[in-house]
Amino acid sequence: MALKIRLRQQGRRNHVVYRLVLADVESPRDGRYIELLGWYDPHSAVNYQLKGDRIFHWLSQGAELTEKAAVLIKQGAPGVYSELMAKQAARKAAVCQKRRAYRQRRSLKRAEAAKAAAK
């Protein structure tokens, strides 16, 4: 069961309000959701309210963000978003380091094999 944090449309015609929800990937846009994580009202003075701790919890559990939800979280909970980006950068750096070490080991083995074949 893959989870996504996305916007769910609410409200009425010409006055749409969005809920930031955690939902299964296969559920419809306005269908069932697992947890309400906040809301966004583009028409009012107070535009949004987000539960930063719950968003961080679900992101650390492996939930994915949609593009629009990521923009809203970056604006409304910058600490959560920056921490998420730092974790992703650290993960990428670790993968790059492992790949670099593997390539070095592989090139050393190839060099040794070439020396042995030359003898």
UniProtKB/Swiss-Prot annotation:
- UniProt keyword annotations, A-Z: Ribonucleoprotein, Ribosomal protein
As one GO molecular function, the record gives: structural constituent of ribosome
Q: Where is the signal peptide?
A: none
Per the database entry, which stretches of residues form a coiled coil?
none
Q: Which is one Gene Ontology cellular component term of this protein?
A: cytoplasm
Write down the Pfam families for this protein, in alphabetical order: Ribosomal_S16 (PF00886)
Q: Which domain of life is it from?
A: Bacteria
Q: Name one GO biological process term.
A: translation
Family the entry assigns: Belongs to the bacterial ribosomal protein bS16 family.
Q: What is this protein called?
A: Small ribosomal subunit protein bS16
**Natural source organism:** Chlamydia caviae (strain ATCC VR-813 / DSM 19441 / 03DC25 / GPIC) (Chlamydophila caviae)
Phylogenetic placement of the source organism: Bacteria, Pseudomonadati, Chlamydiota, Chlamydiia, Chlamydiales
